[in-house]
Regions:
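Sequence-specific dsDNA recognition surfaces
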Residues: 1-7
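Acidic/glycine-rich C-terminal interaction modules and beta/coil loop segments
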Residues: 7-105
Length: 105
């Protein structure tokens, strides 16, 4: 599915994921790796930043924004072909802030 990720390996203090699909292209192309740092949702979420959200439906890479309802966030793709959608905070198991992206070969 577009926007979903496959974990490739873990590193101390963070995680590395491989981007799958084109919903976050061109900035995050399919096959790119993103280095993630776990975020504490209770202390600070940087709205408009890119996160991997570990949800009850799987992991998604999206730019996150607040909504009028504090129990819900809006997730946006980089690719304008994919419309924004909302996710209930209670469906999110963990938040991972994207700190770096690299493309191999």
């Amino acid at each position: 599915m577009n926007g979903f990720l496959n974990q490739s390996r873990s590193i101390p203090g963070g995680r590395v994921f491989m981007v799958s699909g084109d919903s976050m292209s061109p900035k995050y192309p399919s096959g790119a790796r993103v280095i993630l740092e776990r975020a504490n949702e209770d202390s600070f979420i940087e709205w408009g930043a890119v996160y991997v959200l570990d949800t009850i439906d799987g992991e998604i890479l999206k730019r996150v924004y607040p909504t009028d309802d504090p129990a819900v966030i809006e997730c946006r793709s980089e690719n304008p072909a994919y419309p924004p959608f909302q996710v209930k905070r209670e469906w999110i198991n963990s938040w991972w802030r994207v700190r770096m992206m690299f493309v191999l070969g």
